[in-house]
């Protein structure tokens, strides 16, 4: 890009023939006159302003027209700018009076790190420098990867406030140390900072007690005031990810929580961006190619293909009241808890979502969109997040993610088949790629100048449309791994597995489970020497084993037979805006993933090391 020459005065107003868009109609520029650099400024094509939201924002220079002419003054109305310009005609005060200055011959590029479209790309690191973040869900898997990446790549970030559910400040600090700072994920930072690691981390990471389920997100008055004055970016990573959670519990954190956090965000004076970590599966039972579009309040997937007059609107407030009333009427015993779980599944499926988790997350997006006002919003929708691909090292994982119970049970010989469409696709993305895309989106939209009507930007971080992992291929990869690197039983003997059988029929799967359980228990061999009491015990064990496997399959069925493919065009364009250096350090090209290498050499070894702790 050649530089755009601008000045807020009525002189030195000459433009190059290329303009770089930063956000909507904003363009970055610099003033260079008589070989002196006057620094970057910006303008809004056709006028603008900051909409009154940020009184400290730099006032935009209103562009009356951009035109190409070398010999005469041409004036265009503000409504029809010509974007191919060597001469820039400005109306500095937006009053229709135009000024043209030409004759500047030498155009020099501005080398600032934050200019979009130039060699510096999005300027991710420069944006992070000196910024203050508020992150919820900070003790969770993805948030830890995000925190580690920020502190490793931009150690001069100012502060990261971590909203932690705890009874006291001391308890919050204890959770931070035990659940975050002691994690193996941070080993690279430990090596970098050595003995000063803990002091560095506690200087940057500020735990604050709170809960997004509460009003004002549960903050004490002094903490709320401090954060509202200082924070630049809010990241909501808090969620309940249990597919069949109690309806009231899931609504509280996944739907009401984002609304509470947005209410707090609107009090933040310097806020540049609100980022919601959602899931691609908020698209529910949609089929085919699913675009990166935000939800509006009342959207209902079950009826969205009907004629407009026949649509049934989803009333989020009514759903929250329904769950609250049901919880009040019930008791805390196991039967009532199951009823609340069943209620969530029933409500989700009636509106076109497969389970309580994705239904309540979708309603959380609706809450954000309907209450955001002039707060800029980015929604990140990853698919199934699994172990790190590369950073800070390959294979880091915490807890059993979506497909991991199946992977581990298969390796231990406890599961020899599963209910799945063999030709179907498991949409998987490594955690570090999700984090990289998140930081790229933050830099892109966090640097955008204030817009009176900021858009809500959606990025789906998913692999199914551009690099699908087919279930029958996954089964073969699992078999190849465990064939060469088997798990060990309690006696230290290798557990030999067979290629997993895939069933697209519930009846066939059930028959297989029962035969397999009997075979593994020895019931099929007759066992004439076993007394009747032992026989009954073995039959009971077989029955429980079959029930557990069928329960697991029932929960996963909407995903193992999922008919949608997540479009990621916005995400691809975001990546195209990055410099080559940024692509190396913050890459998220899911199309480049070699699934054979990732599954067999990265993900499963990571599971066995970090989840099983080497026990298998």
UniProtKB/Swiss-Prot annotation:
EC number(s) per entry: 1.2.1.84
Temperature dependence: Optimum temperature is 30 degrees Celsius.
Major localization class: plastid
Cellular-component GO terms for this entry: chloroplast
Signals that turn on the gene: Repressed by imazethapyr (IM), a herbicide of the imidazolines family.
SUPFAM superfamilies hit by this protein: NAD(P)-binding Rossmann-fold domains
Top-level EC class as recorded in UniProt: oxidoreductase
Pfam family, one: NAD_binding_4
GO BP annotation list: fatty alcohol biosynthetic process; microsporogenesis; pollen exine formation; response to herbicide
Transit peptide: 1-14
Keyword terms, alphabetized: Chloroplast, Lipid biosynthesis, Lipid metabolism, NADP, Oxidoreductase, Plastid, Transit peptide
Catalytic activity: a long-chain fatty acyl-CoA + 2 NADPH + 2 H(+) = a long-chain primary fatty alcohol + 2 NADP(+) + CoA; hexadecanoyl-CoA + 2 NADPH + 2 H(+) = hexadecan-1-ol + 2 NADP(+) + CoA; hexadecanoyl-[ACP] + 2 NADPH + 2 H(+) = hexadecan-1-ol + holo-[ACP] + 2 NADP(+)
Variation of activity with pH: Optimum pH is 6.
Motif NAD(P)H-binding location, chain numbering: 133-143
Annotated localization: Plastid, Chloroplast
Superkingdom assignment: Eukaryota
GO MF entries: alcohol-forming long-chain fatty acyl-CoA reductase activity; alcohol-forming very long-chain fatty acyl-CoA reductase activity; oxidoreductase activity, acting on the CH-CH group of donors, NAD or NADP as acceptor
Catalytic residues of the enzyme: 357, 361
Deletion phenotype: Male sterility. Very thin pollen wall with abnormal exine patterning.
Tissue distribution: Expressed in the tapetum of anthers.
Entry function: Catalyzes the reduction of fatty acyl-CoA and -ACP (acyl carrier protein) substrates to fatty alcohols. Triggers the accumulation of C16 and C18 fatty alcohols; converts palmitoyl-acyl carrier protein to the corresponding C16:0 alcohol with NAD(P)H as electron donor, but seems inactive toward palmitoyl- or other acyl-coenzyme A. Also triggers the formation of some C16:0 aldehydes. Involved in the synthesis of the lipid component in sporopollenin. Required for exine patterning of pollen grain by mediating the formation of pollen wall substances.
Family: Belongs to the fatty acyl-CoA reductase family.
Name listed for the protein in its UniProt record: Fatty acyl-CoA reductase 2, chloroplastic
Organism: Arabidopsis thaliana
Gene: FAR2
């Amino acid at each position: 890009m050649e530089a755009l020459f601008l000045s807020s005065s009525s002189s030195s107003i000459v433009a190059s023939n290329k303009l770089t868009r930063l956000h909507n109609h904003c363009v970055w520029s610099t003033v260079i006159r008589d070989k002196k650099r006057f620094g970057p400024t910006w303008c809004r094509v056709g006028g603008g302003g900051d909409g009154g939201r940020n009184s400290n924002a730099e006032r935009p220079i209103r562009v009356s027209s951009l035109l190409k002419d070398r010999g005469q003054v041409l004036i265009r109305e503000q409504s029809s700018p010509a974007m191919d310009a060597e001469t820039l005609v400005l109306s500095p005060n937006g009053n229709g009076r135009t000024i043209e200055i030409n004759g500047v011959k030498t155009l020099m590029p501005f080398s600032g790190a934050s200019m979009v479209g130039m060699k510096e790309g999005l300027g991710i690191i420069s944006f992070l420098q000196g910024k203050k973040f508020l992150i919820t869900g900070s003790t969770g898997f993805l948030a830890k990867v995000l925190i580690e990446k920020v502190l490793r790549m931009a150690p001069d970030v100012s502060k990261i406030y971590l909203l932690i559910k705890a009874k006291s400040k001391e308890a919050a600090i204890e959770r931070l140390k035990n659940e975050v700072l002691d994690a193996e994920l941070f080993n690279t930072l430990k090596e970098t900072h050595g003995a000063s690691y803990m002091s560095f981390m506690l200087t940057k990471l500020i735990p604050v007690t709170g809960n997004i389920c509460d009003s004002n997100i549960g903050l004490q008055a002094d903490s709320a005031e401090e954060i509202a004055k200082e924070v630049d970016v809010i990241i909501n990573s808090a969620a309940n990810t249990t597919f069949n959670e109690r309806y009231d519990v899931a609504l509280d954190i996944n739907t009401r929580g984002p609304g509470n956090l947005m209410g707090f965000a609107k009090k933040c004076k310097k806020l540049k961006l609100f980022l919601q970590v959602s899931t691609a599966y908020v698209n529910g039972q949609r089929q085919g190619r699913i675009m990166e579009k935000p939800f509006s309040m009342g959207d209902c997937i079950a009826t969205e293909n009907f004629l407009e007059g026949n649509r049934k609107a989803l009333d989020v407030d009514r759903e929250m009241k329904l769950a609250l009333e049901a919880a009040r009427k019930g008791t805390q015993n196991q039967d009532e808890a199951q009823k609340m779980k069943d209620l969530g599944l029933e409500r989700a499926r009636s509106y076109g979502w497969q389970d309580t988790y994705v239904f309540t997350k979708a309603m959380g997006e609706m809450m954000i969109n309907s209450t955001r006002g002039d707060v800029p919003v980015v929604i990140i929708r990853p698919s199934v997040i699994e172990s790190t691909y590369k950073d800070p090292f390959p294979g880091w994982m915490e807890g059993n993610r979506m497909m991991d119970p199946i992977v581990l049970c298969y390796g231990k010989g406890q599961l020899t088949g599963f209910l799945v469409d063999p030709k179907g696709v498991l949409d998987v993305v490594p955690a570090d790629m999700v984090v990289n895309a998140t930081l790229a989106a933050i830099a892109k939209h966090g640097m955008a100048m204030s817009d009176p009507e900021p858009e809500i930007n959606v990025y789906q971080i998913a692999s199914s449309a551009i690099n699908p992992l087919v279930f029958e291929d996954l089964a073969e990869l699992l078999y190849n791994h465990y064939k060469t690197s088997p798990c060990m039983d309690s006696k230290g003997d290798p557990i030999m597995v067979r290629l997993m059988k895939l069933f697209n029929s519930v009846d066939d799967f059930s028959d297989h489970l029962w035969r397999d359980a009997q075979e593994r228990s020895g019931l099929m061999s007759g066992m004439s020497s076993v007394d009747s009491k032992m026989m009954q015990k073995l039959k009971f064990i077989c029955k429980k084993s079959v029930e557990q496997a069928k329960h697991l399959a029932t929960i996963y069925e909407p995903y193992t037979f999922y008919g949608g493919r997540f479009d990621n065009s916005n995400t691809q364009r975001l990546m195209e805006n990055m410099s080559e250096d940024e692509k190396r350090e913050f890459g998220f090209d899911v199309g480049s993933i070699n699934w054979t290498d990732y599954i067999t050499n990265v993900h499963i070894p990571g599971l066995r090391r970090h989840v099983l702790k080497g026990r298998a």
